[in-house]
From Swiss-Prot:
This is S-adenosylmethionine carrier 1, chloroplastic/mitochondrial. It is a multi-pass membrane protein. SUPFAM superfamilies: Mitochondrial carrier. Solcar repeats lie at residues 52-124, 133-215, 228-310. The lineage of its organism: Eukaryota, Viridiplantae, Streptophyta, Embryophyta, Tracheophyta. Inhibited strongly by tannic acid, bromocresol purple, mercuric chloride, mersalyl, p-hydroxymercuribenzoate, S-adenosylhomocysteine, S-adenosylcysteine and adenosylornithine, and to a lesser extent by N-ethylmaleimide, bathophenanthroline and pyridoxal-5'-P. One of its GO terms (cellular component) is mitochondrial membrane.
Amino acid sequence: MAPLTLSVDVKSSSATSHDVSKRVMQSSQLKINKGFFASVNTQEDKPFDFFRTLFEGFIAGGTAGVVVETALYPIDTIKTRLQAARGGGKIVLKGLYSGLAGNIAGVLPASALFVGVYEPTKQKLLKTFPDHLSAVAHLTAGAIGGLAASLIRVPTEVVKQRMQTGQFTSAPSAVRMIASKEGFRGLYAGYRSFLLRDLPFDAIQFCIYEQLCLGYKKAARRELSDPENALIGAFAGALTGAVTTPLDVIKTRLMVQGSAKQYQGIVDCVQTIVREEGAPALLKGIGPRVLWIGIGGSIFFGVLESTKRTLAQRRPNTVKETKEE
């Protein structure tokens, strides 16, 4: 009886081992890519998850908005007075917190609504678009969030800027007088110019912030710290603020003109400013605006991410992800 022999196909075994190793590496890489570029839960959507994201967005957005507005209101007041001044008018530095309380009453729900709409919209779009189009998802979500928040932002902005320029002494009296003299539409003065400024601003700022965060996470292979989020937020805010300054000047002029109707619309406003004051007038207040929005972006995104993380840690049955070694 011939002895039993065991034949091993070394080439086949090596190939099989190589295939297994390759599949493991591909699986790991897929997880990393999904983590860095999607930043969303890949599990099947549930109604509760949607409403939880919505609720957490409301809380985080409202908190961040109130903190930023309170801290930077004086700079915003100076910026508004610079932009509203015609020719070489002097800027009054008194009453820099004029209208803050009334403005907070509008900023809180507006910021809550913006982030509450932005977060679930972003997550839905990131699941729809491929990874290399994540910027489109962030741009679109930012614009949609800004559109929703504009319903609250515009009346708040009108009242705030009328008070900052000394037309009224209190928010309630401002609302009553504007409504009585200009009608309900007076509270939405400059609405189109507001959208012209804020929709691009929201879309660009959040897109820059999100894309920089994703790139940093990919390079560092870890989550960002609060100071890192704040630094990226400052850069995104300052850059976006500088680019959109002409739009902000136009919006401010249309909102503070009241019933005098010095400008008949966006085009007339631009033409009048350039004709009477020169093109550089469209950049009025760019220094305070960049400073205000840069610092504001730092505070806003720092507080926003910190609040979101705190809320996520308080979720029931939260599964903590292991950090990459």
